[in-house]
Amino acid sequence: MNNDKHKLYMLRILKDVFNDPELSQILAFKGDASLMFFYQLPRFSVDLDFNLLDITQKEMAYQKLREIALKYGRIADEQLKHNDPLVVLDYEKGEQNLKLKLSTRFFDNHYELKNLAGTNIPVMVEPDMFAHKLCALLDRDGMTGHDVFDIHFFLSKQAPIHAGIVEQRMKKLFANYLDDCIAALQTVSTKELMQNVGEFIEGKLKQEMKSGKLIDRTIEMLEERKIVPFITEYPRNRMPIEDVTITHSPEGKNILLAQIAGKSFMEKEISTKEFSIFQALPKDEDRKNFLVHLARENYFDEWQKQSDRNTPSLKR
């Protein structure tokens, strides 16, 4: 594979995607390639991963990605009906195919605009990226070398992590999940990990991966994170949300109800678009996550005022 050529095609497709007035509003860039382009990940990535921010636009986004891919070659494979649409571009015979993947899952992600070759791109922030990468370590059918390598990368640069995403995805406390990761890494085969990452890393890091030193150091740094976790705090994530539901008023409006810290919060009307997204999410877990997101968006200011009133002030 010609890495420079592959990276150039990825760059051109990214520019096409985020210069499109519709796609730029509903897609965000994430995954290994975003780490390579924006966070100096020292290994090569071959696919483009996007989060679909509005699932009601899934078919439109898929068709537009397909049209963009066809500018550069033929479609080697594709799928729309699956929860996560996929377009596989074959841009040249004998070269690595380029996958364009859409994720429809909903988590409490955060994004920031970054510029790439004159194009503004919403990119998942580093703490959230680290969290999803740590989840992927044990969330796949089998542990992969690139996940281990990337986790070592985040730990080595002392990157903060959004622990809330880990707990949301893995359904356990962050510290307990770290123990699971450590236990799994202590038994993994270095030879097996090298099979799917060896060609994408080089030099000293490749030798450390092959010898097992990189895995040992990753375990050591995960142990350190149990003591010094470097957790990124988002103010809205501090809301102790106990229950969120959507009901309908006699006038047909969509009404949000929430129970936060033992108190019922006032009804808030949500938009037709928000209700459509809620209905379109395919999994119960995603709908629950979206309701929590709506509660944080709609009740944060009110909850914060109540919290401030209930917090005793220090007397001078």
PLM feature spans:
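Structured mid-to-C-terminal alpha-helical surface segments
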Residues: 1-27, 40-41, 52-249, 258, ...
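Glycine-rich beta-strand-to-loop/alpha-helix junction loops that act as flexible
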Residues: 29-34
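General alpha-helical segment detector with a strong preference for membrane-spanning helices
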Residues: 36, 50-51
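Short glycine-biased active-site loop of nucleotidyltransferases that positions the nucleotide triphosphate
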Residues: 36-44
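Acidic, low-complexity, intrinsically disordered interaction modules
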Residues: 249-283
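Mixed-charge, Lys/Arg-enriched low-complexity segments
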Residues: 277-315
